[in-house]
């Protein structure tokens, strides 16, 4: 929320109000660039840190939830509910021009990425349960099928135009596969 507030409100204030004031001499260079650096480095930086944490919590929550259908349903519901304010905040001028207001169909919020990531984990686990056996051939088949699921879901994320796109799906999946190694998870 902090980075979205920064991008929606502070960026427009910087461009519409403070930059003309700076150009007119009503604000010093230090003042203008100090506010700009705070907005871009601090507030947007908080948002950059948030996504990996969301992915970690999602993959960990996948193991600890008692009702995965409800978990997926809740994530989808939150993605749909949060899409309207997201689209209005970031893309209202485009959606009005396209006649789809309040929806902008060319970009989806981060919760769609998290929803698809969660769905990927469910499918990966179902594939692992379907392909049983302890032999080397079974393990290779299982890994290849799970990798195929990740690739297909990453393509879907790109087609739907989710925030973080295929990278988000790969990141959630990577945290799932590396869940027993905290050292490798932190390197991601």
Over which residues does each language-model region extend?
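Alpha-helical transmembrane segments and their immediate juxtamembrane cytosolic regions
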Residues: 1-188
């Amino acid at each position: 929320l902090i980075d979205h507030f920064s991008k929606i409100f502070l960026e427009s204030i910087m461009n519409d109000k403070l930059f003309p004031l700076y150009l007119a001499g009503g604000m010093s260079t230090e003042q203008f660039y100090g506010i700009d650096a705070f907005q871009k480095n601090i507030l947007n930086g908080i948002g950059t840190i948030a996504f990996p944490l969301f992915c970690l919590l999602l993959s960990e929550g996948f193991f600890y939830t008692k009702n995965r259908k409800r978990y997926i349903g809740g994530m989808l519901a939150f993605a749909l509910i949060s899409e309207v304010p997201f689209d209005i905040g970031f893309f209202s001028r485009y959606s009005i021009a396209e006649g789809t207001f309040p929806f902008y169909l060319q970009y989806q919020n981060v919760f769609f990425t998290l929803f698809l990531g969660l769905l990927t984990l469910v499918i990966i686990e179902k594939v692992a349960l379907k392909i049983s056996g302890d032999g080397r051939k079974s393990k290779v088949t299982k890994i290849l099928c799970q990798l195929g699921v990740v690739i297909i879901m990453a393509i879907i994320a790109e087609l739907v135009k989710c925030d973080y796109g295929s990278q988000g799906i790969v990141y959630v999946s990577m945290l799932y596969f590396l869940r027993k190694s905290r050292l490798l998870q932190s390197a991601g």
